Amino acid sequence: MNVANLQLEGFMMAVASINNLLVHKGLLSIDEIDTALRKAEASMTGDERTYEDMSPANRDAICFPIRLLQIANNAQGELDIPPFSELAKMVGQTKEP
């Protein structure tokens, strides 16, 4: 696996962990984080000039981190979030055909 991919995996899990902590400290709600992530995805997909020139695989790739964080946010447990491999699988299962 490419080292950059491993770095991004670690970064996404760090952000998911911070989001989890923000929710459990009562600073943000799951819904507030979900709304922010939905806005981020809409911003990415709304840039038609860039987005329309991409292949479907590249579109999925650019949205993958946001979707993974959305799933991690909505799958929060009391203390932990699911492991990266499980979250990535869940992103793949929600992908439109």
Residue spans for each PLM region:
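Long, leucine- and charge-enriched amphipathic alpha-helices
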Residues: 1-38, 73-74, 79, 93-95
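Low-complexity intrinsically disordered segments
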Residues: 37-97
